[in-house]
Each structure stands twice: as C-alpha cells, then as structure tokens.
Amino acid sequence: MGFDDMRRFCEMHDRKIPVFASPATMKGLRNTFRYVFDEPQVWKNYLRIDPEEITAPFQLGETTIVPVDLPHGRFTTTGYVLHRGGRKLVAYFTDCSRVPGEAVEAAHGAEVLILDTLRDTPHPTHMNFEQALEASRSISPGTTYLIHLCHEVSHADKEGALPSGCHLAYDGLTIKAGM
C-alpha cells in the first residue's frame, strides 16, 4: 500500500512524518496500520507519524492548500489545489475516476494541473485519456501533466498526439510553478 514504506524516512531523520488525510482516509489508515498509531512506539524503524485530519484549507509556509473531494470509483480521494500570493499554482488530482464541477471550479486557471490518466480505454476507478483531456479543457490550466499511466501507454506514441500544453509525466520530472 506504500504507506508503510515511509518508515525509512523516520529511521533516517529520527522524527515523525506529518500525514495529512481526510477523516475517512485517516480512519482507514488507523484500521490498516494500527501499530503506527499506537503509542509509545518502541522500534525506531517503525513508521512514526504526526496525523493531521484535513477538513478545510490549511497552510504550509506561505502556501494555502485547498483539499478537493474526488471520486475514485466507489471511494472518495482527496485532490489538492495549491495557492500562493493570490495565484493558483498547482492542482494535483490523482486516483480519480472523474473531476466533478466543484473540483473544476476550485482548480480553474491553475498554472499547472497534474491529472490522473490511466490508459485509452475506460476504467472504473481512473480516468482514460478522453476523460482527462476533457477535464483539462474544463480547468484551463497553463500546463497539464498526465500521471498514473499504466504499462499500456507508449510515451513515444502518446506525447506527440496530445494537445498543446499537455504532456505525459515521467519519473524524475521536475515541475516549476509560481516562478
């Protein structure tokens, strides 16, 4: 599930990791990874977290982070829109099967949109290319990066077929926003 993989960072830095999640997600994490939430934790190599339930926009430094509910099949995930200096810098929408109107409105005009796109054909919990490109058009970002691509997607074939300002993300990609 990936969550437990963060324990290495606790070992390296000898401190807790802040974890931001919706109340429903936090409940699921507590049920699945009970030992992480139990105090005291006697093993240094256990994942140690500082849980923070997200129920409203919050601040990290000068950045305001606005949580946005997104459908992921029958579940709800959380996307984020990052604001700084009155500008929408980044909208991060992954693990979603569509982008509802409230999320489109929250992200509209963001400088960068990072958007879930699994493959060409429909999928019950992720957007396909057609759905993602429609969501991108509705949001009207400066640049869109499509993420969460499956093994069926050929970067060489797809990248050239995308509309202007839309790109396939890749491992190691660095995105600059608000510069």
Question: Where in the sequence are the language-model features?
Answer:
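Binuclear metal-dependent hydrolase catalytic cores
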Residues: M1-F93, A156-M179
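Cap/insert and terminal regions of metallo-dependent hydrolase folds
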Residues: S97-G178
